[in-house]
Amino acid sequence: SYGYBZKSAGVSVPGPMGPSGPRGLPGPPGAPGPZGFZGPPGZPGZPGSSGPM
């Protein structure tokens, strides 16, 4: 071993999209994605879509 544990090389996935915002405002960012196998937290999800004008 060279001090590298494959299990620690987590693969992050995007979180879910945030809810749509009211009155045409952008929704908030989605929640962070789940962590990989002992890897870093996932990237934040995409912002929610715009609500109705």
From Swiss-Prot:
InterPro entries: Collagen (IPR008160). Keywords: Collagen, Extracellular matrix, Hydroxylation, Phosphoprotein, Repeat, Secreted. It is found in: Secreted, Extracellular space, Extracellular matrix. The keyword Repeat applies. Residues 10-23, 34-53 have a biased composition (Low complexity). The modification Phosphoserine is found at S8. Forms the fibrils of tendon, ligaments and bones. In bones the fibrils are mineralized with calcium hydroxyapatite. The modification Allysine is found at K7. It comes from the Eukaryota. The keyword Repeat applies. The modification 4-hydroxyproline is found at P26, P29, P32, P41, P44, P47. Disulfide bonds: none annotated. GO terms for cellular component: collagen trimer; extracellular region. Contains mostly 4-hydroxyproline. Proline residues at the third position of the tripeptide repeating unit (G-X-Y) are hydroxylated in some or all of the chains. Contains 3-hydroxyproline at a few sites. This modification occurs on the first proline residue in the sequence motif Gly-Pro-Hyp, where Hyp is 4-hydroxyproline. Type I collagen is a member of group I collagen (fibrillar forming collagen). Belongs to the fibrillar collagen family. Trimers of one alpha 2(I) and two alpha 1(I) chains. Interacts with MRC2. Interacts with TRAM2. Interacts with MFAP4 in a Ca (2+)-dependent manner. This is Collagen alpha-1(I) chain. It comes from Oryctolagus cuniculus. The lineage of its organism: Eukaryota, Metazoa, Chordata, Craniata, Vertebrata.
